[in-house]
Amino acid sequence: MQKQWQELKEYQKRLVAIDTSGWPISQQVDYHIVRAEMNGLEFDHRVLRPWSRDPSFYAVITTSEPDVPAREGPEIYGVLYMPDYEFPLKGEQKKEFQKKIQAVPILLAQAKKNLTEKGRDLWYFGIIQKEREINVLTGLSRRLMETNPDLVPLVDKAREAVGGFKSWLEEEHGSMARTSDGIG
């Protein structure tokens, strides 16, 4: 995230240095859209900081199609987005799946270090999300027994990591003050 922040600052400097005075309106609109996106990312870094306060940022698998063109809410890169996969997994799809599922234990170990701001409401929803992920991974493991049995141990290891992360969230959540983060 530090690298992203540094790159954002550099891109913002470059954007401000662009003289748009002679541009047609349509290109000026594009410029302002880019500026707005950069401002949004800056807001994420300065205010929201989902990587340090929201366990749901560390989603590892999702099964549903979003109801909007892009995914809603912050999420880490590399989520297993199940609608993208066709079973049995083959070729590049299988390689990508393996890479992402193998990263789950590493990702969640890092998440424990990154989650330094403890917001009770956000952590509660993170616990619910991890329970769903455990159920999805359990079902996926059963499905892969028929189509890709070689992947079952990787999915089981990921499920164990999610279970361990959920237990850690529950333990930490239990010791938090009963205050609200002001969600909603």
What are these regions (language model features)?
Residues 1-184:
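N-terminal maturation segment of proteins
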